[in-house]
Amino acid sequence: MKFYIDDLPILFPYPRIYPEQYQYMCDLKHSLDAGGIALLEMPSGTGKTISLLSLIVSYQQHYPEHRKLIYCSRTMSEIDKALAELKRLMAYRTSQLGYEEPFLGLGLTSRKNLCLHPSVRREKNGNVVDARCRSLTAGFVREQRLAGMDVPTCEFHDNLEDLEPHSLISNGVWTLDDITEYGEKTTRCPYFTVRRMLPFCNVIIYSYHYLLDPKIAERVSRELSKDCIVVFDEAHNIDNVCIESLSIDLTESSLRKASKSILSLEQKVNEVKQSDSKKLQDEYQKLVRGLQDANAANDEDQFMANPVLPEDVLKEAVPGNIRRAEHFIAFLKRFVEYLKTRMKVLHVIAETPTSFLQHVKDITFIDKKPLRFCAERLTSLVRALQISLVEDFHSLQQVVAFATLVATYERGFILILEPFETENATVPNPILRFSCLDASIAIKPVFERFRSVIITSGTLSPLDMYPKMLQFNTVMQESYGMSLARNCFLPMVVTRGSDQVAISSKFEARNDPSVVRNYGNILVEFSKITPDGLVAFFPSYLYLESIVSSWQSMGILDEVWKYKLILVETPDPHETTLALETYRAACSNGRGAVLLSVARGKVSEGVDFDHHYGRAVIMFGIPYQYTESRVLKARLEFLRDTYQIREADFLTFDAMRHAAQCLGRVLRGKDDHGIMVLADKRYGRSDKRTKLPKWIQQYITEGATNLSTDMSLALAKKFLRTMAQPFTASDQEGISWWSLDDLLIHQKKALKSAAIEQSKHEDEMDIDVVET
């Protein structure tokens, strides 16, 4: 389908378009014209990704000054899906235009997913893979090999060295599988192929961390130009990603490992002093001249990037007391020993970075300035010593990153020292949490650097919370409804059981036997009437375990077994993957299954249950965060004092965005259908419901907001009977989707109404002039 938005020709790779897709593309185009930040909430399953890509690729080709799209998503599966959509779009553009445009689209993920080296790819831990990769690909390793030394290298990486960076791969859209196959065929490293081709790409699709986490962004995204268009897709959790990228946890175990790493560094320094003291002398001279000079090496060799934001890195020489290698090692020893003594606590301590630094100075005489240079100084030392096996240095990296962060940032951070790592632990296992409280710190450089930033998801409501939390002004802020020829999803609020007892996951009520029994009855009854797959979500793993145990003793699970298999999500990703595969198999072969999951878990965030895989979703309770968490309490206090966001408002906003995310799992298109059950009396209150996305709110009828279990079952049965009636594509024509003719008619009407509005406005202006 080809149509115009203003003067921009759009090629859309489907013969039909949803009305909300067209509106979304219009708003996208206007926000790109204006520059700045747009916040757009698009309903689940309405083709958000292809709308974005069609509009922005057309915009790129029409306005060549906007040459690059940086598309950030959260999970591997979403990156793969976006690349597949882009590939389809470019194939369609080629067929319509009659020639192939010079276009390169690439996706980037971690070494763990792209590595081809036989021994490295076997490793399960991402940090170990990164370290092993560096030990084979660092510049000095290659130099040693060329000098005739017998050192292991990676042939996949070595084969890239003789090629020009811009000619590693040909134009086209390369999915992650494509680039891996190409690497196997040509014996070239897929990871470094993509890394080196990023400056030459038209579209880059990768994870948020490549742009928001300074430790990664400084290596990967530093060379991207300011005229890039940045899209954060599935961005409902973007504030949490920002906070995690600047937060660090240290435990006693990590400090012990850091001490071992310091000892091995010391040993290496002594060896180098004996064999080649000029190395250390050269490094010292470079540090005297200035740190940037010392680190002027290939980014691919870098041991670690600076954990602070680029504008917060000090552009000056390293302080004299940590320039010499032996002095720096003594400095690290002293700091780690100090942290170990701080760990010996029996009660919780919370303090600001300023008071922590003052305490460090009082006890150890360590100043703030050298701490601030720790990360860069360690990187320089590891490079000078030419240490290739760095996998044991991960804990030391964390310690120096902590030192650099705590000495750099005074506002928006807190240190919390807890004697127990988990709430229900009995054996002391102290943990030092350095937590970022202000999400705007990490994203601010992105807003300042790039001309256009689009933040979009299916669950951003209430929209006004994000500009407050992330400190930005929008040029466009919109939540779209959903146009349906028939209501293909049924959202309803169940506030009480069949015995009229109110149901809630509130802490005081959650273990009440009548509430547990009523929740169990809801699961049993919906298992009976729902065909194929049913997904249930709970506020936490703790509550899930507790209620499943109670249901087992009440015989409720035995009752559910009669109708469907029962599978449970666990914190272990491998177990959860296995449970999902079994769930899908049971749905496909007609046995049917119930998947018991957790809001904020893997299932709620990245797994789609389209068609028969999810005919109903039940949200048991409201997924509030654990409010006794000290980090959360500190963040709530910060939001209240700094941005005037009340605690209750933030907690409700956070809970409702996760509830909406869970509900959206079962609706993956307008030809799909599903039941959405909100099982908690608190959902009956309008202050909760109004925080749901517009596309869910518009289909919650007044009669479905205060139901008992029996009433909800009657509504669900009626809905499923309706969905079973024949419903063809022609029934949706002109309502839930438009052909090209429908679209042109709509555009004419819009132009006509705009002209009428304009003439009215001019008439009013004339009247004002006459009166004056």
From Swiss-Prot:
User: Quick one: effect of changing K48R?
Assistant: Very UV sensitive
Annotated Gene Ontology cellular components are: cytosol; nucleotide-excision repair factor 3 complex; nucleus; transcription factor TFIIH core complex; transcription factor TFIIH holo complex
Q: Where is the Helicase ATP-binding domain?
A: 7-283
| Annotated PROSITE patterns | HELICASE_ATP_BIND_2
Cofactor details (free text) = Binds 1 [4Fe-4S] cluster.
User: Which positions does the motif DEAH box occupy?
Assistant: 233-236
Q: What is reported when this gene is inactivated?
A: Essential, it cannot be deleted.
Q: What top-level branch of life does the organism fall under?
A: Eukaryota
Per UniProt, where does ATP bind?
M42, P43, S44, G45, T46, G47, K48, T49
Entry cofactors:
[4Fe-4S] cluster
Where's it found, cell-wise? Nucleus
Reply yes or no: does the keyword Ribonucleoprotein apply.
no
One MF term in GO for this entry?
damaged DNA binding
Cross-referenced SUPFAM superfamilies: P-loop containing nucleoside triphosphate hydrolases (SSF52540)
Alphabetically ordered keywords of this record: 4Fe-4S, ATP-binding, DNA damage, DNA repair, DNA-binding, Helicase, Hydrolase, Iron, Iron-sulfur, Isomerase, Metal-binding, Nucleotide-binding, Nucleus
* Gene3D superfamilies, per the entry: P-loop containing nucleotide triphosphate hydrolases
The entry's family comment says: Belongs to the helicase family. RAD3/XPD subfamily.
The UniProt entry, under PANTHER family, shows:
DNA REPAIR DEAD HELICASE RAD3/XP-D SUBFAMILY MEMBER, GENERAL TRANSCRIPTION AND DNA REPAIR FACTOR IIH HELICASE SUBUNIT XPD
Q: How does it assemble?
A: Component of the 7-subunit TFIIH core complex composed of XPB/ptr8, XPD/rad15, ssl1, tfb1, tfb2, tfb4 and tfb5, which is active in NER. The core complex associates with the 3-subunit CTD-kinase module TFIIK composed of mcs2/cyclin H, mcs6/cdk7 and pmh1/tfb3 to form the 10-subunit holoenzyme (holo-TFIIH) active in transcription.
The name on file for this protein is General transcription and DNA repair factor IIH helicase subunit XPD
